[in-house]
UniProtKB/Swiss-Prot annotation:
PANTHER family: 1-DEOXY-D-XYLULOSE 5-PHOSPHATE REDUCTOISOMERASE, 1-DEOXY-D-XYLULOSE 5-PHOSPHATE REDUCTOISOMERASE, CHLOROPLASTIC. Gene3D superfamilies: 1.10.1740.10, NAD(P)-binding Rossmann-like Domain (3.40.50.720). Pathway: Isoprenoid biosynthesis; isopentenyl diphosphate biosynthesis via DXP pathway; isopentenyl diphosphate from 1-deoxy-D-xylulose 5-phosphate: step 1/6. GO terms for molecular function: 1-deoxy-D-xylulose-5-phosphate reductoisomerase activity; manganese ion binding; NADPH binding. This is 1-deoxy-D-xylulose 5-phosphate reductoisomerase. Its EC number is 1.1.1.267. Its cofactor is Mg(2+); Mn(2+). GO terms for biological process: isopentenyl diphosphate biosynthetic process, methylerythritol 4-phosphate pathway involved in terpenoid biosynthetic process. Coiled coil: none annotated. Pfam families: DXP_redisom_C (PF08436), DXP_reductoisom (PF02670), DXPR_C (PF13288). It catalyses: 2-C-methyl-D-erythritol 4-phosphate + NADP(+) = 1-deoxy-D-xylulose 5-phosphate + NADPH + H(+).
Amino acid sequence: MKKLSILGVTGSIGTQALDVIKKSNGELKLIGATANSSVNKMIEIIEEFNPKYVGMMDKNSADKLEKYCKERNKQTIVLSQMEGLNKIASLEEIDIVLTSLVGMIGLEPTLEAIKAKKDIALANKETLVVAGELVMSEAKKNNVKILPVDSEHSAIYQSLRGNDLKTLNKIILTASGGPFRGKKLCDLNDIGVDDALNHPKWNMGRKISIDSATLMNKGLEVIEAHWLFNCDYDNIQVVIHPQSVVHSMVEYCDGSIIAQLGAADMRLPIQYAFNYTERKNLIAKTLDFYEVAQLTFEKPDLETFKPLKLAFKAGKQGGLMPTILNGANEAAVALFLDEKIEFLDIFNIIENCMNTFEEETKKPLTLENIIELDKKVKKYVVDMK
């Protein structure tokens, strides 16, 4: 039996991970789980999965949950805030941690888990975007596996299995193109929140849905792929694939291309990471090629969807520039979701921040500098609104 902690258990990835655990015939067990403030959802999880530990980032929510557990004589231990997240990420009795928190908040507990020598099922892409060098170095030092949960990176991981990385020629990351595929800049002036959240293929959380609409999600995945697979940015290609059947591809030095195909179901890469490459039965819809009918591929429009272009630029510059990119994007997306800025303002804010904070990139890449700069960039974005 494999014992797990899930950071961000009430979100989209966390919820689907629970379904994987439920269908594992007792081979997977939830030991620790964290959420931000969703008390009612966490109560349901306690009742169904009986985790030994739960953590809430919001202290008031933790107090409510603790009261619930005491009144019903539940043995679940309730922890709170970042200290609680870090403890649940590094529990002695667990084997693997799923980090499915959204944003920079996932960095610190991920590092704590790695230091505790826990394998990481990584769904929090921002961790590698801002601190890829630190995370991969720490993972190597502690002999920890970083197992990708993003469908694209899981596809690459699977396509690389059994082959020498030295023979890798190119990584081809596929993207659905989001809800605005084919549109030009002038078509994006009056985009509302509901329009941007309406992803054609994937059922995702609000923040990642907006990132998919701007193509920033693919930009973050480019940086993530660079660190996961030690691949130069010039050898990472993004291809628009609206059917979302080919999850990504790998081109080898002889020109051969290996791809991973499957239904658009996040439970597949989650289960693959949990079982560390061992194939297990999963009751899910499989791919029917008669239904698919055709597979098409297009070049991304980098002039319209500038965030993807900016992500390549930030990744190539390295150091603290990806922290600026990510912090500006997180803050801008939050403002857009609150209907305080327009859709295209997200693009302009990211570029503005990359120019404004250029001098900050001369500082060394440390955890302290990453956290400090992230706060500084986000405050700047909120203040400029």
